[in-house]
C-alpha cells in the first residue's frame, strides 16, 4: 500500500465512495433561520466537484426544543429546510459526490445563540422528553433516506446531547438512563441508534461520531482503558452503527499507554467495523488553537497518516479546516500539487465558499 491507496474506492452496503477522504462536519451558521439556501448547496457542491469522497454536512438539528444554539444552524425538519437539503443532495450528486447529514441535538450548551425570548435554566430530561427525542432522531433519519442522502451520521461527540449521556461528568441521572458504568450510560445512544436503524432499514449506512474530548474539556475521558472502550462501543455496534467516526484533536496521538493506536484504531480493533480518523490532518496545530486563540496553522505532511492507514488502523480520513479553506484540497493532494496548498487562516471560518 502507498500514498495513492488513499484515493482508492470504498464500498460498504450501498455506500460507494470514489476515495477515502471525507469532509468533516463543520458548523457554519449560514442557513438563515435554519433554512439551507443555494449558497450552502454551492459550498458543498464545490467539494463534490473536486473529488471529496464523502461529504458530511455540518450538524443539522432534529425537531426538538433547544436542539440548537444558533438560529442560523440548519434545521432537519419542516418543509422549507428539507427542500433546501434536497437541493444540496441534488447538487452534490450532480457533481459526482456522496453526502450524509450529521444529525444533531446540542443538549445543554449555555454558550451561543440568545433566543428572542427568555427561557428557564435547562432541566433534566423527563422520560417523556427522552422518548420524544428518540422519536425525533428516527424521524430525521427517515427524512435523510427520503431525500436521497447516501448515508447519515449521528453526532455523539464533543459534549453534545448524546455525548452528555455517555460522560459521567454530565450524566448524573439515577434512572435507567444513568449509572456508574459507560455501558449503563449508553442506553440513550443505543435506543437512538435502534430508532434510526428501524427508520432507514438494513441497507443505509449509519455513522456515529464519538470522542473522548468535549468542547469544554479537552482532557475529558470516557474510556480510560481498552476494556472500558469495549463496554462503550460494542453495544453501539450491536445496536446498528456501521461506521465509527472517531474524533481526536490530533490523529497521531495514541489513545492508551502501551500502544500507538489512535482512537479510530482502537474502535476498529474492538468492533471490527470500519472507522474514520480525524484530527489536524495536513496541519501542524489542532482545532483547539483555533477556538481558544483564533490561530491559523501551517501545513504538515501526511506521512504518519499514510503509515497508519497502511497498517489498517482506519478506513477513511476526515479533513476539516483544510477543506474549509480550499475546496480542491483532495484533488490537489491526489495529483501531488503540493505547491498550490496554503497554510490555514482563521479568517476562513467566516467565509462560505
What kind of feature is each model-predicted range?
Residues 1-353:
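Flavin-dependent oxidoreductase catalytic cores
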Amino acid at each position: 500500500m502507498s500514498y495513492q491507496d488513499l484515493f482508492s474506492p470504498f464500498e460498504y452496503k450501498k455506500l460507494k465512495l470514489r476515495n477515502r477522504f471525507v469532509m468533516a462536519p463543520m458548523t457554519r451558521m449560514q442557513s438563515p433561520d435554519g433554512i439551507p439556501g443555494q449558497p450552502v448547496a454551492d459550498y458543498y457542491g464545490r467539494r463534490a466537484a473536486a473529488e471529496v469522497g464523502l461529504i458530511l454536512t455540518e450538524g443539522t438539528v432534529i425537531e426538538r426544543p433547544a436542539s440548537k444554539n444558533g438560529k442560523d444552524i440548519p434545521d432537519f425538519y419542516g418543509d422549507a429546510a428539507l427542500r433546501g437539503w434536497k437541493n444540496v443532495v441534488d447538487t452534490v450528486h450532480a457533481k459526482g459526490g456522496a453526502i450524509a447529514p450529521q444529525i444533531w441535538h446540542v443538549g445543554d450548551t449555555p454558550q451561543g445563540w440568545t433566543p428572542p425570548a427568555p427561557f428557564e435554566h435547562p432541566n433534566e430530561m423527563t422520560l417523556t422528553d427522552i422518548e420524544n427525542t428518540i422519536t425525533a432522531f428516527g424521524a430525521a433519519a427517515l427524512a435523510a433516506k427520503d431525500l436521497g442522502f447516501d448515508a447519515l451520521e449521528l453526532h455523539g461527540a464533543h459534549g453534545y446531547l448524546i455525548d452528555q449521556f455517555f460522560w459521567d461528568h454530565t450524566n448524573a441521572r439515577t434512572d435507567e438512563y444513568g449509572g456508574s458504568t459507560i455501558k449503563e450510560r449508553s442506553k440513550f445512544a443505543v435506543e437512538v441508534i435502534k430508532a434510526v436503524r428501524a427508520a432507514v432499514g438494513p441497507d443505509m449506512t449509519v455513522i456515529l461520531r464519538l470522542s473522548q474530548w468535549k468542547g469544554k474539556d479537552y482532557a475529558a475521558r470516557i474510556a480510560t482503558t481498552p476494556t472500558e472502550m469495549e463496554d462503550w462501543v460494542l453495544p453501539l455496534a450491536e445496536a446498528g452503527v456501521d461506521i465509527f467516526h472517531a474524533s481526536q484533536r490530533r490523529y497521531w496521538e495514541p489513545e492508551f499507554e502501551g500502544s500507538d493506536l489512535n482512537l479510530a484504531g482502537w474502535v476498529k480493533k474492538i468492533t471490527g467495523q470500519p472507522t474514520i480518523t480525524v484530527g489536524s490532518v495536513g496541519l501542524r496545530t489542532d482545532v483547539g488553537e483555533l477556538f481558544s486563540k483564533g490561530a491559523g496553522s501551517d501545513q504538515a505532511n501526511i506521512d504518519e497518516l499514510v503509515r497508519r492507514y497502511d497498517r489498517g488502523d482506519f478506513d477513511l480520513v476526515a479533513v476539516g479546516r483544510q477543506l474549509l479553506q480550499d475546496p480542491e484540497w483532495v484533488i490537489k493532494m491526489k495529483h501531488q500539487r503540493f505547491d498550490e496548498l496554503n497554510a490555514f487562516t482563521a479568517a476562513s471560518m467566516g467565509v462560505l465558499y
